[in-house]
Amino acid sequence: MDSEIVERLTKLGFVKTSHTHIAGEPLVIHAVAGAGKTTLLRSLLELPGVEVFTGGEHDPPNLSGKYIRCAAPPVAGAYNILDEYPAYPNWRSQPWNVLIADNLQYKEPTARAHYTCNRTHRLGQLTVDALRRVGFDITFAGTQTEDYGFQEGHLYTSQFYGQVISLDTQAHKIAVRHGLAPLSALETRGLEFDETTVITTKTSLEEVKDRHMVYVALTRHRRTCHLYTAHFAPSA
C-alpha cells in the first residue's frame, strides 16, 4: 500500500525529503493549503482496506460507510490514515500507517515529513505573496497572473465582507461592536468560506505573535480574502 500512495503522491507533485522512511513506521506527509491533500485522501478511500480519519472537519456519514471519519483509534486489520494528525492528541502512541497534515497550521511540534508539497492550486498569487512575506514556504501553482481574490485595506475605514476572522482580541472586539460575528483564527482551522475578512489591530502581519494563526486566517477563503491592518499602504 505504501508504494501505491507514493505513486499517487508523485503524480500530485509531492516531493520526497531527505528523511528516510523506515518500514513499520508511519509515512508522514505535509502539504500546504490547496496542494491536493483532500483529493488524495478521497482517492485513497476507494482502495480496499483503507480507513481515513481526521483531526479536522470530518465528513457526514454516507450509505457506503466509506468517508473521512472523526479521529478515533485505528481499525484493526485496516490500512489507517490520520489526516490533520497534530490536532489528535494520541497520534504518537497509536499504530497509524500514514500521518498527513498541513503542518503550518499548528504551533505544536510535528513529525518529520517523508513527502511534502508547497504548491497551492487554490490560493492566488497575491495571497501567496502575503504568506511568503511572513516567512512561509508556499508557491503559486496556478496560471492566472492576477489575483482578484486578495485585497488589502485599513481596519478602521474599510467595509467587512463574508466571514470575519480576527488575529487579536482588540480586532475581535471591534468586529463585535459592528454587530458582526467574528471567529478567531484558531476557530476557523479546518474550515473554508467563499469570502473572508481578516482583521488585526497590528500595523503589519509581521507584528502578529502567533505566526501559524496568520497562515490559518489567510488560507480559509475559496474565492476572496480581504486583509485589514491598522496601517495600510498599497504594495508597490
Curated annotation (Swiss-Prot):
Where, subcellularly, is it found?
Answer: Host cytoplasm
Instruction: Describe the location of the (+)RNA virus helicase C-terminal domain by residue ranges.
Output: 118-236
Please tell me whether the keyword RNA-binding is annotated for this protein.
Answer: yes
Pfam families with a match to the protein in the record: Viral_helicase1
Q: Which SUPFAM superfamilies match?
A: P-loop containing nucleoside triphosphate hydrolases
A single GO CC term for this protein reads:
host cell cytoplasm
Q: How does it assemble?
A: Homodimer and homooligomer. Interacts with capsid protein. Interacts with host AGO1; this interaction targets the host protein for degradation, thereby suppressing the antiviral RNA silencing.
User: What does the protein in this record do?
Assistant: Transports viral genome to neighboring plant cells directly through plasmosdesmata, without any budding. The movement protein allows efficient cell to cell propagation, by bypassing the host cell wall barrier. Increases plasmodesma size exclusion limit. Acts as a suppressor of RNA-mediated gene silencing, also known as post-transcriptional gene silencing (PTGS), a mechanism of plant viral defense that limits the accumulation of viral RNAs.
Q: What is this protein called?
A: Movement and silencing protein TGBp1
Species name: Foxtail mosaic virus
